[in-house]
């Protein structure tokens, strides 16, 4: 049976939300581990919250903290949605090699995004930028490896589910 997923339906949306949540969590755990291990601020949700504080947005610090976490997971979802399109359109196969390629590209995008964010907000967190960007690069590779593995597994489940159940 040759199954090609649609770009988006309810099953795919649920699949992408679950995958992005798990992959973003894996990336975040890696960043928190590196932060603790090297005693540096490598925590993306905390950095996003700090950027929001720097922007003088008129909401409470608790809201800024929650918004930082929310944005982190939304960005993770957007990355996974793009991967899904790449895989669904057969631009790349779902494979360890595509995970590595997408991880490298995502890492570069992540680094460029943080350089841009720090530049436009004039926020200078107390971290070694070179070390942070190296850690961020590898965090994105971990993110993409987890996303690819889960995508493959959930694709199998999706095929079986659609064969036997309808919503």
Task: Set out the residue ranges of the language-model regions.
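Juxtamembrane/disordered regions of integral membrane proteins
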Residues: 2-167
């Amino acid at each position: 049976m040759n199954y090609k997923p649609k770009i988006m339906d309810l099953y795919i949306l649920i699949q992408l939300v679950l995958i992005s949540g798990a992959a973003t969590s894996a990336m975040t755990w890696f960043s928190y581990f590196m932060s603790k291990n090297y005693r540096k601020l490598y925590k993306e949700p905390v950095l996003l919250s700090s950027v929001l504080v720097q922007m003088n947005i008129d909401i409470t610090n608790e809201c800024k903290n929650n918004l930082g976490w929310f944005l982190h997971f939304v960005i993770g979802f957007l990355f996974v949605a793009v991967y899904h399109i790449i895989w669904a359109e057969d631009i790349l196969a779902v494979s360890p090699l595509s995970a590595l390629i997408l991880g490298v590209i995502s890492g570069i995008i992540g680094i460029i995004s943080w350089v841009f964010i720090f530049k436009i907000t004039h926020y200078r967190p107390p971290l070694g930028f070179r070390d942070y960007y190296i850690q961020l690069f590898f965090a994105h590779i971990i993110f993409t490896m987890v996303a690819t593995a889960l995508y493959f597994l959930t694709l199998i489940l999706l095929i079986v589910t659609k064969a036997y159940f309808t919503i």
